[in-house]
Design a protein with these regions (language model features):
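Hydrophobic core of transmembrane alpha-helices in multi-pass small-molecule transporters
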Residues: 103, 115-130, 320-321
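Helix-loop-helix hairpin linking two adjacent transmembrane segments in secondary transporters
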Residues: 145, 153-198
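Central cavity-lining transmembrane alpha-helices of secondary-active solute carriers
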Residues: 65-81, 273-285
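Structural signature of the two symmetry-related core transmembrane helices
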Residues: 91-105, 297-312
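Extracytoplasmic gate region of multi-pass secondary transporters
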Residues: 42-44, 222-280
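Juxtamembrane intracellular "pre-TM" segments in multi-pass secondary transporters
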Residues: 10-18, 198-228
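Cytoplasmic helix-loop-helix junction between adjacent transmembrane helices
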Residues: 120-156
Length: 321
C-alpha cells in the first residue's frame, strides 16, 4: 500500500543509524502499551467482583490463568503454522488486537459468574500471540547492536500495559465495567495505529517450525538452562502480577479497618499499578545494561532480588505501604 517503505528507503546512507528508527520503535511501544492492557483487565477488578457477586476463589483464579493458558496455546499454534511469516506483521497485530478487544468487551454483556467469561479470557490470551511475540519480531527488524535496549523497551511497554488496568480502576471509580471497557477501546486504537509502523531493513522470516526444535531446546544445555530460568521467572512474575492486587486489597482492608472499603480498594489499585508499572523502568535500564554488562549476569542478579522480594512480602501482610 501507499504506507509501505522498502528497505533502501529506510537506511541512513551516513551509516549513523536507521532513518525513522526511533519514531517507529516508540509507535510500536505505544501500541504494545495500549493492546497489552487487555491481559489483566479482568484480573484488576477481581476484588470488586468477589465483593459484589460472591465470585468463587477458583473462578477468580481462572480469570488470570485462562489468559496465560490461551497465550501458550496461541503462541504454539502460531509457531507451528508459521502465522507470523504467512501474515504481514502489522496485519497480524491488528487482527489479534481487534479479536482480543471484542472478546474482552463481551465480558460486559455476561453475568460476572458466567463460565463463558473464562473462555473469553482464554481467547484473549490466545490473541496475545499476535501482539507480544510479533512485536518482538517487529522491533528486532530495527536492531543494530542495541538488541538489549530494544527488547527492554518492548518489555517495558508490555509491563506498563499490564499495569494500566489497575489505574483504569482508580479513575473509573467503583464501577468495574469502566476498566474492562477502556481496555477494549485502547486495544482497538492499538490495532489501528500499528498500520503506521514501518519495519526496519533487518526484517526477516523465521525458519519453519520443526518438532525437532522441541528436543533441541532440551538437549542443548545453555538453551535448556535459559528456558528453565525463564520458566521459573515467569512462574513467579505472573503469579505476582495476577495476585498482588488481591493481596494488597485484603492487606489494606485489614490495616485500614472496617468502613474503609473504598479507600482500601483505591489504595490497592494505586499501589498495584506502581508495583507492576515500575517494571517498566527495570526493563528499560535492564536493556541498557544487558548490552554492556552481559545478559546472564544481569539476569541472575535481577532474578535473585525478585525472588527475595517474593519471599519477604508474605510476612508484611496487614502492614501499610
Amino acid at each position: 500500500g501507499g504506507g509501505e517503505m522498502n528497505n533502501s528507503a529506510v537506511v541512513d546512507p551516513s551509516g549513523a543509524g536507521l532513518a525513522g528508527k526511533w519514531p517507529n520503535i516508540f509507535l510500536l511501544a505505544l501500541c504494545e502499551v495500549l493492546a497489552l492492557s487487555l491481559w489483566f483487565s479482568a484480573t484488576a477488578v477481581i476484588p470488586e467482583l468477589k465483593s459484589a457477586y460472591d465470585l468463587p476463589d477458583w473462578q477468580a483464579s481462572l480469570f488470570s490463568s485462562a489468559v496465560a493458558m490461551g497465550f501458550v496455546v496461541g503462541t504454539m499454534t502460531s509457531a507451528i503454522l508459521g502465522l507470523a511469516d504467512r501474515i504481514p506483521s502489522k496485519r497480524f497485530f491488528m487482527i489479534a488486537a481487534f479479536i482480543a478487544a471484542i472478546a474482552n468487551g463481551l465480558i460486559l454483556v455476561l453475568p460476572p459468574t458466567s463460565m463463558l467469561i473464562i473462555f473469553l479470557r482464554f481467547l484473549t490470551g490466545a490473541c496475545m500471540a499476535g501482539l507480544y511475540p510479533v512485536g518482538m519480531k517487529m522491533v528486532a527488524s530495527w536492531a543494530r547492536g542495541d538488541t538489549g535496549l530494544l527488547v527492554g523497551l518492548l518489555v517495558g511497554a508490555l509491563t506498563l500495559g499490564s499495569a494500566s488496568p489497575h489505574l483504569f480502576k482508580i479513575t473509573g471509580g467503583v464501577d468495574w465495567r469502566f476498566a474492562i471497557g477502556l481496555a477494549s477501546v485502547l486495544a482497538i486504537v492499538a490495532g489501528l495505529l500499528i498500520n503506521f509502523f514501518q519495519p526496519g531493513p533487518l526484517e526477516k522470516k523465521s525458519p519453519p517450525f520443526r518438532p525437532a526444535y522441541l528436543l533441541h531446546a532440551w538437549t542443548d544445555k545453555p538453551l535448556r538452562l535459559a528456558n528453565l530460568g525463564y520458566f521459573g521467572h515467569m512462574w513467579e512474575l505472573y503469579a505476582m502480577w495476577a495476585w498482588i492486587g488481591v493481596f494488597l486489597h485484603a492487606s489494606f482492608t485489614q490495616s485500614l479497618g472496617a468502613g474503609q472499603g473504598d479507600a482500601a480498594s483505591h489504595l490497592a489499585g494505586l499501589v498495584t499499578f506502581l508495583v507492576v508499572g515500575v517494571g517498566t523502568l527495570g526493563a528499560l535500564f535492564g536493556g541498557l545494561l544487558a548490552d554492556r554488562l552481559g545478559r546472564t549476569t544481569l539476569t541472575m542478579a535481577a532474578m535473585a532480588i525478585s525472588g527475595i522480594c517474593a519471599i519477604a512480602i508474605g510476612f508484611l501482610f496487614g502492614g501499610n505501604i
